[in-house]
Amino acid sequence: NQIGEEIAATNNFPVINTQQCYDKIQQLTTDTALVLPAITLAEQALIIYTSGTTGNPKGVMLSHNNLFEMYYALRSETPLLGPGAVNLIAGPWYAVVGVGYFVFGIFSGCTNVLLKIFDPIEILRLIQTYKITNAFFAPIMMKIICALDEVHEYDLSSLQNIQYGGSP
C-alpha cells in the first residue's frame, strides 16, 4: 500500500502491511487444507503490563479470547474500520494501549503507523503526513499534545476518532 511504501522509504521504519495480514486471515478461514495447531480460545496469547496507576505495574495474561473480545469491543466504539483506515499506535508496546490497538488494526485490515517511543511533535507530523484516522492515547499523552504551541501548525483534519485510557 502506498502509505506503507512511503513510510518505509522516508523513515527507515519496518512496515507491516496489515491489509496483506487481513487478506491472509480471510483466506485461512476458507482454506480446508490448512492444519491449525490445537489451541483453545482460553489459552494464553500474550502477556502485557498494567499502567501501575494503583501501585507497581503487574503482568496480565491475555487469552486468545481476550484478544477477540477486545477487538469486538473496540470495533463497536470505532466508526472507521477496515481498509482505508489509518491507525496511529503511540502507546507503550508492553501495555494494552500499544498491543491492543495493533491487534485491532490487524484484525480490521487497517493500516497501522507505529511509533517506537512517545514523541508528541512526531505524533502531530505523522497525523498530518499519513492522514491518521484513528488514535488511542493515554490521558497524559493527550494532555501533553494539547498543550503544545505547535499543535496549530499541523493539519489534523483526517483524525476522526480518538480513544483514551490507561490512567485516571
Predicted regions and their residues:
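Conserved AMP-binding A3 loop
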Residues: 45-72
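Conserved G/P- and acidic residue-centered "switch" motifs that form tight phosphate/ATP-binding loops
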Residues: 53, 109, 166
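Conserved pre-ATP/AMP-binding loop-to-beta segment of ANL
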Residues: 31-49, 56, 80-86
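Short beta-strand->loop structural element characteristic of the AMP-binding/adenylate-forming
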Residues: 1, 14-18, 58-61, 89, ...
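Conserved AMP-binding/adenylation subdomain of ANL enzymes
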Residues: 68-86, 94-133, 148
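Adenylate-forming
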Residues: 91, 132-168
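ANL superfamily adenylate-forming
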Residues: 3-41
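Short, structured coil segments at secondary-structure junctions
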Residues: 10-12, 108-109, 158
